[in-house]
C-alpha cells in the first residue's frame, strides 16, 4: 500500500536527517487513531524527537477520512530558507499548486511520489508541468 510505504519513507528520512543534526517537523493529513487529531509534530532533533515522530507515525489511522493535504499546506507557512520535502502518492493539481506556494518554488523543495511500476510513465506525464523537483519512488524497485 502506498500510504504505508510513504510512512516508511518518512521514518527513514526522519532518522537520517536527525542523525546528521538536521531538525525535522512533520505536517500530515494523517489522523492519530487514538486522539482522532491530525498528526503534526513541531520541529526538533535528537533521540526523543525521533521517538515522538515514530510513535505518531505508528499511530496513524490509514483508513480514516482525511482533509485534503493542500488545505493543510495552505495553513502553514514555510520560511524562505526552509528545506521542504513532500512525501505523497496523491498527484493533484491543487496539491501541486499548494506545495509550490508553500515551498516558494525554490530548489529547496522536493516532492517524493511513491508509485507502482506500471504507473510511472503516466505519473511523470501528469505532473510534467510542476517546476518543483519531483522524484518517483517505484515501490517494486525499493529494497525492503
Each model region followed by its residue ranges:
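Exposed, interaction-prone extracellular/peripheral surfaces
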Residues: 1-144
Amino acid at each position: 500500500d502506498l500510504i504505508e510505504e510513504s510512512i516508511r519513507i518518512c521514518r527513514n528520512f526522519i532518522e537520517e536527517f536527525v542523525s546528521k543534526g538536521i531538525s525535522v517537523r512533520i505536517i500530515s493529513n494523517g489522523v492519530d487513531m487514538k486522539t482522532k487529531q491530525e498528526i503534526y509534530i513541531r520541529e526538533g532533533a535528537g533521540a526523543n524527537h525521533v521517538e515522538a515522530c515514530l510513535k505518531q507515525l505508528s499511530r496513524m489511522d490509514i483508513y480514516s477520512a482525511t482533509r485534503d493535504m493542500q488545505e493543510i499546506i495552505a495553513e502553514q507557512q514555510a520560511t524562505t530558507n526552509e528545506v521542504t520535502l513532500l512525501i505523497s502518492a496523491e498527484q493533484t493539481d491543487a496539491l501541486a499548486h499548494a506545495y509550490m506556494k508553500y515551498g516558494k518554488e525554490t530548489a529547496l523543495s522536493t516532492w517524493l511520489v511513491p508509485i507502482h511500476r506500471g504507473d510511472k510513465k503516466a505519473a511523470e506525464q501528469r505532473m510534467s508541468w510542476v517546476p518543483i523537483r519531483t522524484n518517483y519512488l517505484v515501490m517494486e524497485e525499493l529494497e525492503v
